[in-house]
Regions:
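Conserved RecA-like P-loop NTPase ATPase core
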Residues: 18, 34, 48, 79, ...
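Short pre-active-site segment immediately N-terminal to the catalytic Zn-binding motif
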Residues: 122-132
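Conserved catalytic/switch belt of AAA+ P-loop NTPases
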Residues: 1-36
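Short, glycine/charged-enriched secondary-structure capping and boundary segments
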Residues: 28-33, 53, 148, 171
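Conserved C-terminal "switch" segment of AAA+ ATPases
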Residues: 7-13, 26-27, 40-108, 113, ...
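Asparagine-centered polar/low-complexity signal
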Residues: 1, 19, 85-88, 282
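Soluble catalytic regions of large protease machineries
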Residues: 132-134, 141-288
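N-terminal alpha-helical segment
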Residues: 30-33, 64-68, 86, 271, ...
Length: 288
């Protein structure tokens, strides 16, 4: 084929990129075709620092207080494009405020805006709703503070941003290996908002939707992907080839499906009750 090359000295190199290498035709990956594969992960803290330095160069006036090491640590999971957006947004924020130089707070505000969306300070919220949101976010903050493996909290706000009425920002550790106790602590912290509503008001609300989505995905991953459940065992139903997307049947029986659903539910309920217990024992800290 043309990709193989008709001659030996054509000096033509074919380069391609994809986010879904798992669904490509295997014939494309044969020797003589795309026989060099380079996996590009999201930048780590050192690489983010270097990317910040590149994107800060065009900004003519940057305050001396700005520390690229600090900014790299504040942006885990950010891509190069995200960091470019942070720098551009920080410059715009500084310009709107009439500043002579882009400062550290401008960058932190830019990170908040990119992660959480635009502030909606004019959104009408009743005092009762505001109180419920405040205790919900305080629940997240209290649980993350009390648990050893939960990601440290960076910021809590009840100012509406994007589609959320409040938010808690964390600074997750960039781990290559995650232990079960670390995942359980993260689930417990995520359920801290709903647990706080239950402890303070003895009622729950719809405000925990994103938290429930997060813990359900984590619990399902523990049970069906990473083999971290004793009842289901050391099995994984994760198909890294991507072929499972085209199958209409599950790779396990109905009995196993029921067991998986039960274990996922048990995991989430255990962490919810754990969060309630922690908050009841530290109600004074929650109320502060």
């Amino acid at each position: 084929t043309e990709m193989d090359g008709f001659g030996t000295n054509t000096n033509v190199i074919v380069v391609a990129a994809t986010n879904r290498a798992d669904v490509l035709d295997k014939a494309l990956m044969r020797a003589g075709r795309f026989d060099r594969q380079i996996y590009v992960d999201l930048p780590d803290v050192r690489e983010r620092k270097e990317i910040f330095e590149v994107h800060l160069r065009p900004l003519k006036k940057v305050a001396d207080e700005l520390d690229t090491d600090f900014m790299a640590k504040q942006t885990p999971g950010f891509s190069g494009a995200d960091i470019a957006n942070v720098c551009n947004e920080a410059a715009l924020i500084a310009a709107r405020k009439g500043k002579q130089a882009v400062g550290k707070q401008d960058f932190l505000d830019a990170v908040d805006r990119i992660v959480g969306g635009l502030e909606k300070k004019n959104k009408i919220i009743t005092p009762e709703e505001k109180q419920a949101i405040a205790f919900h976010e305080a629940g997240h903050a209290t649980i993350s503070w009390m648990l050893e493996h939960a990601a440290p909290l960076v910021k809590v706000t009840i100012v509406p941003r994007g589609q959320s009425l409040g938010a808690a920002w964390y600074l997750p550790e960039e781990r290559l290996i995650v232990r079960p106790e670390q995942m359980l602590d993260e689930m417990c912290a995520a359920l801290g908002g709903r647990a706080a509503e239950k402890v303070i008001f003895n009622k729950i609300s719809t405000g925990a939707l994103s938290d429930l989505e997060k813990v359900t995905k984590q619990a399902r991953a523990m049970v069906t992907v990473y083999g971290l459940n004793d009842k289901v065992g050391n099995l994984t139903y994760h198909d890294s080839s991507g072929q499972s997307e085209y199958n209409f049947t599950k790779p396990y029986s109905e009995k196993t499906s029921e067991l998986i659903d039960k274990e996922i539910s048990n995991l989430i309920e255990e962490q919810y009750q754990r969060a309630i217990k922690i908050l009841e024992e530290n109600k004074d800290k929650l109320s502060k």
